[in-house]
């Protein structure tokens, strides 16, 4: 229903549906980034009706010891499945059951090597406003035992060496995100969040082999500025940015 409303040409939404559809669809943007030479985690895209033996043969040929399956269109980790290749080869029904269950809700899925560094080093979430880097945080999962306020440890990203690797990747990503078209004019998005993880192919941290894990539309991504230590004045900056964008598009 929401997709139908957003895609209706009579709907006056911002960012326009075409842009949001690109951001929401990992297959679209990961494919574009790969073809543009932007580092991503090698990815297999499959339908819910996937042939399991064929998929396992492909995973085995890549020598992935562990892998993750994510539904395209899922969010906040919903529907993610984590598997060990050796176990699934011995008992493929576990993977079959996963697709039987989740194909009720999703048409397509992506399959990737499990990156050990995601939990070990966390994920760098970088925020870009008006095409410029503004700030970044790092989130690290907390084991689900005991009570805690937030599901992750969240801190400002201040490591200059890591930022020196991530920011150039982010700049390349912004260049490949399609322009918005609104009121007959082309323009850039107001805010984009670019999330990066280390390390590609489970290389050691010293490799600094960060890659793009996902991107988010800035207005919906969450700024994390309600977390202690994250002090960027996001409300004031975004308010000014959206007013400038409105003036630009409505002139």
PLM region spans:
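Domain-wide signal for the mature, well-folded portions of proteins, strongly enriched
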Residues: 1-6, 12-17, 190, 200, ...
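Basic side chains
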Residues: 26, 70, 125, 139-140, ...
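Phosphate-binding site of ATP-dependent enzymes
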Residues: 78, 82-184, 197-200, 208-211
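ATP-dependent carboxylate activation and anion-phosphoryl transfer catalytic cores
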Residues: 142-145, 165-251
């Amino acid at each position: 229903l929401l997709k139908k409303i957003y895609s209706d040409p009579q709907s006056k939404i911002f960012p326009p549906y075409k842009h949001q559809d690109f951001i929401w669809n990992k297959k679209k943007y990961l494919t574009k980034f790969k073809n543009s030479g932007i580092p991503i985690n090698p990815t297999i895209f499959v339908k819910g009706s996937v042939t399991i033996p064929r998929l396992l043969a492909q995973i085995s040929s890549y020598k992935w010891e562990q892998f993750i399956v994510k539904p395209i269109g899922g969010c906040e980790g919903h529907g993610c499945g984590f598997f060990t290749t050796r176990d699934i080869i011995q008992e493929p029904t576990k993977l079959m059951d996963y697709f039987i269950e989740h194909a009720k809700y999703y048409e397509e899925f992506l399959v990737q090597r499990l990156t050990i560094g995601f939990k070990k080093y966390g994920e760098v979430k970088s925020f870009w406003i008006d095409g410029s880097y503004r700030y970044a945080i790092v989130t690290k999962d907390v084991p689900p035992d005991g009570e805690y306020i937030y599901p992750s440890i969240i801190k400002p990203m201040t490591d200059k060496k890591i930022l020196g690797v991530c920011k150039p990747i982010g700049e390349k990503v912004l260049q490949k995100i399609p322009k918005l078209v609104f009121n007959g004019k082309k323009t850039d998005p107001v805010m984009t969040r670019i999330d990066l993880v280390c390390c590609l192919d489970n290389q050691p941290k010293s490799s600094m082999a960060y890659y793009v894990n996902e991107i988010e539309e800035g207005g919906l991504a969450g700024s994390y500025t309600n977390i202690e230590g994250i002090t960027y004045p996001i409300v004031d900056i975004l308010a000014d940015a959206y007013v400038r964008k409105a003036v630009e598009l409505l002139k």
